[in-house]
Structure formats: structure tokens, C-alpha cells
Amino acid sequence: MSTLQKTLIAACIAGAFVPAAHAEKYFSDSSISILYSDDYQAFGKTKTTQTFFTFENATGHDWGSTFFFVDRNQGHGKDTDTDDLYGEFAPNLSLSWLTGNKLGGDGLIKDFTLSGQYEFGGGTNVNNYMVGPGIDWNMPGFMYFVTRFYYVDSETSDDYQTTVVWGKAMEFGSTRILFDGYIDWSTAEDDHKSDFHFNPQLKLDLGNYRGSPGVLYAGIEYSYWNNKYGLNDDVMDTESAVSALVKFHF
């Protein structure tokens, strides 16, 4: 086991097994999503029709936060053999909590983090281990806005990744819209290209009309993925896929 993997595992354990007497849980949110698109990019410069079933869980604590999701995709027609499973687990340790000193506050920077991420499965059957610093921002108008800067121990040559995650709610009378998503950008190395993935969702809060905001959403997801999986255009075209989605929180 590499030093990076040991560091990541230690961070996960430190966050997940904080003694109950010294830990406070702020929230836990789970959701199930269904997405459908005819435009997902596949190997061989072809497009595929897929339905994705996604389970997500996010938690917030005084010591930091966790995020976990797993995707199960179902191909259709000629793409029925493209089914696979992909997931990520991302713990974040608050450096304010870890050091006992308030490193952020009411200004632009909310906190600094030690962040990790484990990626598994998917079309290339990855096992990637990621660790690095992060910043949680007090971005005006946003529910959350975070940046992460990872060193990536991957099955190809190790590289670096910058991740931006955001969530913003917009209200127009009784209509509530949620705009959230992420951006991943990773560096190029000898055996793979730099890749850029922009993946926002725009969702209508259906539950808000019945007095239950934040429960049931319907909308679209857009995936723009240049050099998908670090592959160049000779192998796979840039992905530009719009998906219909429904999402239920519980």
C-alpha cells in the first residue's frame, strides 16, 4: 500500500470515527436520481443511449464532511453491453477543527480542509486515490462553494486534479430552481491527456409547490467532457450530453 493510500485511509478513519462526545452532526442528506440521454460518448467515437441510476449521500459535521455516490448505468438497444458501476467517496477534514483554531469565518473563506477521494469502477474500471488541500468558501448567493486540489494516485501515471463544486438556489415567487454541479480539471502526463469535465444540473423544485422544498426535483444535466478518461480525440470524441433527470431526496 502506498503512502498516499495510507494517508487517505487515515483521514477517512479520523473523520468517520471521531468520538461521539466530541463530534456534532449538522446534517445528512440522501437522494436517488434517474438520468436518461442519447448523447453519452463511448469508446470508438460513438454515442450511446444510457439510463443512470444514482444514489448519493452527503453529511456535515463539526469535524468536516463526507460525500458518497454510486452510479449504475443501463444501456439500451445496441448499447446493452455497456452496463457498469462507478462510485466515489470523498471525506473532508476541517483544519479549523483539527487545529483547534478558527482558520476561516464570516469573510470570503469559510474554512480550509484536508480532503481525500476514492474513485472505483466505471468504463475504465479505475481505482484512484486522491488527497490534497481544499477551501470552503462563503460565496455570496451560494448555498455552498468549494475547491479541492488533489494529488491523484491512479492506475495510469499519477497526476493532479482541481475540483470545483457549487450549489445555488434561485426563487421566483413560488418557483424555486436549484443550479448545482462540479468542474474537474486534471493535468496531462506521459500516458494520458489533460481532461476537463463540466457537469452542471438545473432543476425545478417540484416539492416547493406543495410546501415540501428540497424533496423532489426534475430538470436537466449537461456533461461537457473534453479528453474523457484522459483519451484524445482519436479514441473518443468530446462528450456534450444533455440528460433528463428526476431526483428524490430523503
Please name every model-derived segment.
Residues 22-28, 63-67, 95-113, 138-145, ...:
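Short loop/turn motifs that connect adjacent beta-strands in outer-membrane beta-barrel proteins
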Residues 34-40, 72-76, 116-122, 149-155, ...:
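Transmembrane beta-strands of outer-membrane beta-barrel pores
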Residues 23-73:
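Short glycine/proline- and aromatic-enriched beta-strand/turn motifs that initiate or cap beta-hairpins
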Residues 150-215, 224-226, 248-250:
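Outer-membrane beta-barrel transmembrane domain signature
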Residues 55, 89-91, 131-133, 164-166, ...:
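Membrane-embedded beta-strands of outer-membrane beta-barrel proteins
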Residues 238-250:
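Outer-membrane beta-barrel "beta-signal"
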Residues 1-27:
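Cleavable N-terminal export/targeting peptides
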